[in-house]
Amino acid sequence: MIDFEIAFRYADEKSPVLRQIAGNIPKGRCIVLCGNSGCGKSTLLRCINGLIPQFYEGERTGFCQLNGQDTAGMSIGEIGELASSVFQDPRSQFFTVNSSNEVAFGLENHGLPQEKIQQSVDEAFRIFHLERLKDRNVYELSSGERQLISILSAWAMDTEIFLLDEPTANLDFAATQQLKRILFALKRQGKTLLLSEHRLYYLAGIADEYWVMENGEIQGKYPAEEARKFSPEQRQVLSLRTLDLAEISVPEKPQLLKAVPEVLCVSDVCYTYKRKLNSTLSGISFSVRMHEIIGLVGANGCGKTTLGKLIAGL
């Protein structure tokens, strides 16, 4: 289903990012690319989905085949009929302003009948219980909500291959569980999945193998059953995060002295975006003392990024 042997160097780089990297992924398998940032995961996906060399310039050698077809002579559109892609930053793949139109965009470009397009769009939002995101301005959505729209867009294309580049980078826990259900559904349908990830816990029961990359090479290919048995020390050597959230512990930190001065004070902050009826922020108040670390947590769209932009003066 996916077969490749690739080396690649970006046009402005002296050293290759991928060093004659090879792999074969049979139909219906889910492979997870792991490794530290900069090891070549995203570059490999770009080589497979055609963005390299058609968008990112550089020197590429080797081959890539999807469903037995060599992608070397294909346009990005032709590759898109075989494989759907989800990128780290959903804004980089949006072509419309309306969320429903975005999910329909790929189907329209492949010439499907309007009735079929509308059916697929409605089904995508309904199956994954995301009706609240229909007909929304994508630039008024949170980063996590935009990522969900990009995932629905890929799902609606109904290709045999799905390529996902760190799809949970902007997702909260609940949205990550939604993505897990989407991937489960695709796996049951016999789709082939290749994704790069740092978070691994949600892929239990979905991933068949974990391929660990380092310096543009695949250092090891580990079946899911073997990876689950890794000790914390083994995972640390391989730069793998935990596969089980129950293993995570949070050490207690010493309390700050009461005399430590405040360095940030937020008092009764409210904010409403233009064209929105409801407030994004309402009555937010807190203070931060010197050397104190505060984590803002909450569901996608609750206002975390908006609050950060207000504090930064953006």
Describe each PLM feature range.
Residues 34-36, 297-299:
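The feature captures the beta-strand-to-loop junction immediately N-terminal to the Walker
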Residues 63-78:
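ABC ATPase NBD Q-loop/coupling interface
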Residues 115-133:
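Conserved ABC ATPase "signature" region
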Residues 137-141, 145:
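Conserved ABC ATPase signature
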Residues 151:
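Hydrophobic anchor residue at the start of the ABC signature
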Residues 154-155:
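ABC ATPase C-loop
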Residues 162-165:
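Catalytic Walker B motif of ABC-type/P-loop ATPase nucleotide-binding domains
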Residues 197-198:
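H-loop/switch region of ABC-family ATPase nucleotide-binding domains
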